[in-house]
Curated annotation (Swiss-Prot):
Natural source organism: Bacillus subtilis (strain 168)
BP term (GO), one: negative regulation of DNA-templated transcription
Protein purpose: Negative regulator of class I heat shock genes (grpE-dnaK-dnaJ and groELS operons). Prevents heat-shock induction of these operons.
Protein family membership: Belongs to the HrcA family.
Protein name: Heat-inducible transcription repressor HrcA
Keywords annotated in UniProt: Repressor, Stress response, Transcription, Transcription regulation
Gene Ontology MF terms: DNA binding
């Protein structure tokens, strides 16, 4: 159990190191307004904190820096969100000012603004397409036996699919097909489209379209491949280059390489928990992330978690500011999505 004096010194060391990226010595601490102890007392308390594993010495300086244990204690016991500025809030609110809400544009804009506001890398995990429902479908012929199906969901997501017909299709049949699909599938969840086609749509195709069985096979392969996995949106992928810890090109290269691996990124940012989650250094289970911290926050629709937002920064990241930003963005995004899904 740390004493109040040790808690204060640890907090001041971490706050100063977050701002300066420079090891903190007893002389620096003695100049802080909140530190009223003698230099000898400060040195003794720092020695105790080092022995307890909360701070550590660097090779290049006589000062001390926080250890992972120190950051963890800080995050768990000393962290308090900061009040965001009007400029911060204006930028966040700008994400949701568009009259026509399009999910992908909004999510991408969220990622970009978060990276701009933090100067770190942001990753937004979008909702699974299967959690949307079909709003409209268009089919545009591009060759006699080929067309592009444009699927629009209730969230504004647009997906293009190529349909390969076994034989040449008449334009009148394509028009009938579009009318049938929109009439029978509008409002159907995306992951149920294939099932509905073979249970309900098939009888209408049989009645109105010649060679309907060929069309059925083409639709089967088209809708079977509809993407049901989450999409990742990035902001500020190279922002880490601005951090002193990542002036080592080898370290930067390994981190950027990890970020390019979609499955690894999904494992990093998918969170089974609601609210804010903070992983520091080696807690991330990836060697490339041992000098980084990852803060994730979930967003939801009607209390159901459907996606998450993550910020990757150095272990020296400004935790208080990032947590405050994530809380505001996820809250606004959840409200916007709940309104959209309830339409």
């Amino acid at each position: 159990m740390l004493t109040n004096r040790q808690l204060l010194i640890l907090q001041v060391i971490i706050n100063d190191f977050i701002k300066s990226a420079q090891p903190v010595g007893s002389r620096t601490l003695s100049k802080k307004d909140e530190i009223t102890f003698s230099s000898a007392t400060i040195r003794n308390e720092m020695a105790d904190l080092e022995e307890l594993g909360f701070i550590e010495k660097t090779h290049s300086s006589s000062g001390r820096v926080p250890s992972e244990k120190g950051y963890r204690y800080y995050v768990d016991h000393l962290l308090s969100p900061v009040k965001l500025t009007k400029s911060d809030l204006d930028q966040i609110h700008s994400i949701f000012k568009e009259k026509i809400f399009e999910l992908e544009k909004t999510v991408q804009k969220s990622a970009q603004i978060l990276s701009d506001l933090t100067n770190y890398t942001s990753i937004v995990l979008g909702p699974k397409l299967s959690e949307n429902y079909l709003k409209q479908i268009q089919i545009i012929p591009i060759q006699p036996d080929m067309a592009v199906a444009i699927l629009v969901t209730n969230t504004g997501h647009v997906e293009n699919k190529t349909i390969n017909f076994p034989t040449k299709m008449d334009l009148s049949d394509i028009e009938k097909l579009v009318n049938i699909l929109n009439d029978r599938l509008s409002g159907v969840p995306m992951d149920e489209l294939n099932e509905r086609i073979f249970k309900e749509v098939v009888m209408y195709l049989r009645q109105h379209i010649k060679n309907y069985d060929n069309i059925l096979d083409a639709l089967r392969s088209t809708f079977h491949s509809t993407n049901h996995v989450e999409k990742l949106f990035f902001g500020g992928k190279i922002n880490m280059l601005n951090q002193p810890e990542f002036h080592d090109i080898t370290r930067v290269r390994s981190l950027l390489s990890l970020i390019e691996k979609e499955q690894d990124v999904l494992k990093l940012v998918q969170s089974p928990h609601t609210g804010i989650s903070i992983k520091i250094g080696k807690e991330n289970d990836y060697e490339e992330m041992e000098n980084c911290s990852l803060i994730t926050a979930s967003y939801s629709v009607d209390q159901k978690q459907i996606g998450s937002i993550a910020i990757i920064g150095p272990t020296r990241m400004n935790y208080s500011r990032v947590v405050s930003l994530l809380q505001h963005v996820t809250s606004d995004l959840s409200k916007a999505l709940t309104s959209l899904y309830d339409e």
